[in-house]
Amino acid sequence: MSSTQEASVTDLPVKRPREAEEDNNGGAMETENGGGEIKEPSCMSSIIPGWFSEISPMWPGEAHSLKVEKILFQGKSDYQDVIVFQSATYGKVLVLDGVIQLTERDECAYQEMITHLPLCSISNPKKVLVIGGGDGGVLREVARHSSVEQIDICEIDKMVVDVAKQYFPNVAVGYEDPRVNLIIGDGVAFLKNAAEGTYDAVIVDSSDPIGPAKELFEKPFFESVNRALRPGGVVCTQAESLWLHMDIIEDIVSNCRDIFKGSVNYAWTSVPTYPSGVIGFMLCSSEGPQVDFKKPVSLIDTDESSIKSHCPLKYYNAEIHSAAFCLPSFAKKVIDSKAN
């Protein structure tokens, strides 16, 4: 990875709508102050200079803003724009294609829930596959489970891995675990080639269903996941916000109910810096031993001496595990309507 690239707040360009970015072939952009051009786009607000504003057609008519103290890194990989900045209130922030992926302050709520909701729902998981998750946070959490013998991670963008290791060492610490096998490549292709019944659990830590992550929300991908799971194996995938994306969630639930013949459930957690402040997960099991996702059956290894460089859990516990499946009435009505 290239050396640290720093820029002043006022040198950053105004955010374009995401569709415009997809049509752009990496050309230069005009900066806010009109002083020259740089190639890396950002989401700095043109209304309030010095603030990052997350703007996307995925959540029209609204934006979430964070005050920027310093830009730590700007880069463009083969797949997406990557930015790291120091915020005034949430620590360091990782942004991919203009969308916040994690902040030091609240990443625990996402990483812990997407990992422990599935892994604590089955007994003694041994082989785990992570699709995406290049920042390493899911790896950190999987490593808390002493029964796990093999952790494969397939991340398409090596720049994300390198940036996480440099700027988010407490998140990327998972890469230090000897059980981890990193594959830089396309998760869709990797799963197509995976042997049937290989994994006890698959965790899909994807970004929004736009650009390189789009295929991770489509039916053929879920079919590949189901084939790669052992009987009664589980999958947990990022499944958008119930406040913003019920149409997307409805499609995901419908696809999952068609494919996974075990349990199919939707859960959610609170992440302040994600759009609407919440993010959801689809949890499904393959045909075989019944899985009740709402009742955790496995405990997390809390012996910190056996977990290299791990801090204690900050968000997950058994009570919040069960509570995560309690849905507001409007969401429950839509999701239940897709029941077979």
Swiss-Prot record:
Q: Which residues carry this modification: N-acetylserine?
A: S2
Chain residues that bind putrescine: Y110, D205, S206, S207, D208, Y274
Catalyses: S-adenosyl 3-(methylsulfanyl)propylamine + putrescine = S-methyl-5'-thioadenosine + spermidine + H(+)
EC number(s) reported in the record: 2.5.1.16
Region described as Disordered: 1-41
> Pathway, according to UniProt?
Amine and polyamine biosynthesis; spermidine biosynthesis; spermidine from putrescine: step 1/1
Q: Which Pfam families match?
A: Spermine_synt_N, Spermine_synth
| UniProt superkingdom | Eukaryota
Catalytic residues, per the record, are: D205 (proton acceptor)
Is the keyword Translocase in the record?
A: no
Q: Which GO terms describe its biological process?
A: spermidine biosynthetic process
The record places domain PABS at: 49-286
Any idea which GO molecular function terms this record carries?
A: spermidine synthase activity
Q: Alphabetically list the UniProt keywords.
A: Acetylation, Polyamine biosynthesis, Spermidine biosynthesis, Transferase
Keyword Acetylation attributed: yes
Kindly list the positions annotated as binding S-adenosyl 3-(methylsulfanyl)propylamine. Answer: Q80, Q111, D135, E155, D186, G187, D205
Q: Which terms in the GO cellular component ontology are assigned?
A: cytosol; mitochondrion; plasma membrane
Q: Which family does it belong to?
A: Belongs to the spermidine/spermine synthase family.
Q: How does it assemble?
A: Heterodimer. Component of a multiprotein complex. Interacts with SPMS and SPDSYN1.
Instruction: Report what the protein is called.
Output: Spermidine synthase 2
Question: What is the protein's species of origin?
Answer: Arabidopsis thaliana (Mouse-ear cress)
Q: Gene symbol?
A: SPDSYN2
